[in-house]
Amino acid sequence: MPELPEVEVISNFLLDKIKNKQISNVIVNNWNLRAPITKNIDDMLKGKVIRNIKRRGKYTIWNTDGSVAVIIHLGMSGKLIYADHDQMRNKHDHVVFLFSDNTSIIFNDPRRFGLVIVLNKEQETDFFSDFGIEPLTDEFSGDYLQELLKNKKVNIKSALMDNKSIVGVGNIYASESLFRARISPLRSAKNLTYRECEKLAAEIKNTLSDAIAAGGSTLKDYAQPSGSAGYFQNNFYVYGKVQKPCKICNNIITLIRQNGRSTYFCNACQN
């Protein structure tokens, strides 16, 4: 699943390519994703101009001049593809946004866990109302993290992946950030010291920023709208490295399951 860095890379690409473009048509080839695509999406968006593109958590948001926004989540396997109008369509191209300059954005999603909806400003505010803090903001700090975690009765990795507390830190970047901070994913969240919270907050920011600079992580499905792969996976310390030596100490990387998700860590470096 694309996480915060991948969606940030996608949103930045789209901001450069489709800001101030007018939507001429929206073609829906499959209405049934994880939730139905907004009815009358073509009528709602036809003639609208894209004024801004931003990210919230793992969602990319296209604000238009018509007080409505397109909200897209890529699910497990979704992609947004930048193409000309006449590019040959593929089997899983569920939604095609056509622009007046003969370019298009194609939403392709083989597993159909993605989301494409249109909301007005009030609906957009309500939709994101229970989302947690953005980890790349100045407000996200050691002080904030310690206050957030002090009553959490879960392990630290699960706490980091709670979207109502912190958005966008998915499985990959939780594992990598905890390694960089030298904190075991098995630790109780509420027992982290202030110094550990300070270190962890910094390493979450560093890990996410490094991943964005690398174009994200391409493991299976993710690609940038241009078709280019990300390469942050080449810099992983622990994720996907089960039974391989730790880059720091040569101890063998451990794989466990936490809340149904794979967790990778070095039990020598992380405590």
From Swiss-Prot:
Positions with a binding annotation for DNA: 92, 111, 152
Record flagged with keyword Metal-binding: yes
Reported cofactor(s): Zn(2+)
Active-site residues annotated for this sequence: 2 (schiff-base intermediate with dna), 3 (proton donor), 58 (proton donor), 261 (proton donor)
EC number: 3.2.2.23, 4.2.99.18
Domain of life where this protein originates: Bacteria
SMART domains: Fapy_DNA_glyco (SM00898), H2TH (SM01232)
Cofactor note as given: Binds 1 zinc ion per subunit.
Pfam families associated with the record: Fapy_DNA_glyco, H2TH, zf-FPG_IleRS
Biological processes, Gene Ontology terms: base-excision repair
UniProt keyword annotations, A-Z: DNA damage, DNA repair, DNA-binding, Glycosidase, Hydrolase, Lyase, Metal-binding, Multifunctional enzyme, Zinc, Zinc-finger
Molecular function as annotated in GO: 8-oxo-7,8-dihydroguanine DNA N-glycosylase activity; class I DNA-(apurinic or apyrimidinic site) endonuclease activity; damaged DNA binding; zinc ion binding
ZnF FPG-type span: 237-271
Catalysis performed (reactions): Hydrolysis of DNA containing ring-opened 7-methylguanine residues, releasing 2,6-diamino-4-hydroxy-5-(N-methyl)formamidopyrimidine; 2'-deoxyribonucleotide-(2'-deoxyribose 5'-phosphate)-2'-deoxyribonucleotide-DNA = a 3'-end 2'-deoxyribonucleotide-(2,3-dehydro-2,3-deoxyribose 5'-phosphate)-DNA + a 5'-end 5'-phospho-2'-deoxyribonucleoside-DNA + H(+)
Subunit record text: Monomer.
Family under the similarity heading: Belongs to the FPG family.
PANTHER family associated with the record: FORMAMIDOPYRIMIDINE-DNA GLYCOSYLASE
Role according to the record: Involved in base excision repair of DNA damaged by oxidation or by mutagenic agents. Acts as a DNA glycosylase that recognizes and removes damaged bases. Has a preference for oxidized purines, such as 7,8-dihydro-8-oxoguanine (8-oxoG). Has AP (apurinic/apyrimidinic) lyase activity and introduces nicks in the DNA strand. Cleaves the DNA backbone by beta-delta elimination to generate a single-strand break at the site of the removed base with both 3'- and 5'-phosphates.
Name recorded for this polypeptide: Formamidopyrimidine-DNA glycosylase
Organism: Wolbachia pipientis wMel
Lineage, uppermost ranks: Bacteria, Pseudomonadati, Pseudomonadota, Alphaproteobacteria, Rickettsiales
